[in-house]
């Protein structure tokens, strides 16, 4: 038997083993050559990666809301650069949830900055495409969510457009550029990820808001309308008051006795905090607006501001602290083995 034939049989045997484990989809890395990080592509049983990518693009074209966001053009991604997701590097992966067209290209500053910080902490970044379950059945979607929880110990919900108000049982009074199809997918993904309790979730701006909605919280649809303009929450900087929490993720970075940090601000909506939920209030603006919440179980941090765009020492420290907390709640496989 020739060497190339032996390799082919080995690959086919691995594929059969993957399906035998009961997975309805396999996760592939898709590196088409013009994205900042590999795209995570779910491949159904009986599909090749090329067929899965074609299916995703075809189904994307059938979504009017999403195509309007893409201005009528699907992302220009080559049907090449596929390989199965490595099963042996789980602890060092970070998954960024795409929600804007620029996340598919080379010019997304937030993806650039997240990737840089994560690389410094020896984490590889990956991009989950918008509505990654396009063309999947309900059961296949559930399997996709389960595998994301199992294979990505770090997930980032990034900034972007407003969340559809009907998803937190409110009428639209001040929300802009809402896309229910996209929001519903992200909410279901976040619900599943949090429920699995196998990873750490970082939510930034919109990511904080949609994560809070997934956890049963509501949003203030327009901060100036509801609380006035005492604090400028638009394109500006302002101080926040940091509160001590159970895990003190953000509080551990406060250098001053008064518990204040200077952060950037690029939003007009905010989470309406409530007691007795899964989140703990971690920071507020001087006008009382929620600026940060932490998961009571230590497995998440939701920030209204953008540490990845602060471009200063504090922004980097915040992201490093988040990676540190992720490592605290995610013991390595070696430690689990020796604990047996």
Predicted feature descriptions by range:
Residues 1-20:
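Classical Sec-dependent N-terminal signal peptides that target proteins to the secretory pathway
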Residues 19-202, 213-220, 224-256, 260-262, ...:
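N-terminal beta1-alpha1 cap of cysteine-dependent amidohydrolase-like domains
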Residues 205:
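Catalytic nucleophile serine of serine hydrolases
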Residues 209:
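Cytosolic ligand/metal-binding cores
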Residues 301-305:
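Active-site-proximal beta-strand elements of phosphoester/diester hydrolases
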């Amino acid at each position: 038997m020739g060497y190339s034939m032996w390799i082919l049989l080995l690959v086919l045997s691995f594929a059969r083993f993957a399906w035998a484990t009961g997975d309805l989809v396999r996760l592939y890395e898709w590196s088409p050559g013009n994205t900042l990080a590999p795209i995570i592509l779910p491949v159904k049983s009986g599909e090749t990666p090329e067929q899965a990518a074609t299916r995703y693009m075809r189904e994307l074209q059938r979504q009017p809301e999403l195509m309007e966001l893409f201005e009528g053009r699907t992302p220009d991604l080559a049907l090449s650069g596929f390989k199965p997701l490595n099963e042996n590097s789980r602890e060092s992966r970070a998954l960024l949830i795409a929600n804007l067209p620029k996340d598919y290209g080379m010019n997304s500053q937030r993806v650039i900055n997240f990737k840089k910080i994560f690389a410094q902490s020896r984490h590889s970044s990956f991009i989950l495409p918008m509505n990654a379950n396009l063309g999947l059945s309900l059961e296949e979607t559930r399997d996709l969510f389960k595998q994301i929880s199992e294979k990505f110990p770090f997930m980032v919900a990034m900034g972007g457009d407003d969340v559809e108000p009907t998803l937190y049982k409110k009428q639209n009074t001040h929300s802009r550029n809402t896309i229910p199809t996209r929001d519903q997918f992200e909410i279901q993904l976040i619900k599943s990820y949090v429920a699995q309790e196998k990873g750490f979730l970082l939510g930034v701006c919109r990511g904080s808001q949609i994560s809070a909605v997934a956890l049963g919280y509501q949003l203030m649809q327009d901060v100036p309308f509801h609380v006035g303009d005492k604090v400028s929450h638009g394109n500006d900087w302002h101080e926040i008051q940091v509160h001590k929490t159970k895990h003190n993720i953000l509080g551990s970075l406060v250098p001053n006795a008064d518990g204040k940090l200077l952060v950037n601000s690029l939003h007009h909506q905010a989470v309406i905090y409530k007691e007795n939920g899964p989140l703990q209030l971690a920071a507020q603006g001087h006008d009382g607006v929620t600026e940060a919440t932490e998961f009571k179980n230590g497995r998440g941090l939701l920030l209204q501001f953008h540490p990845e765009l602060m471009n200063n020492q504090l922004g980097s420290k915040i992201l490093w602290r988040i990676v540190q907390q992720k490592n605290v709640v995610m013991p390595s496989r070696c430690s689990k083995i020796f604990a047996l």
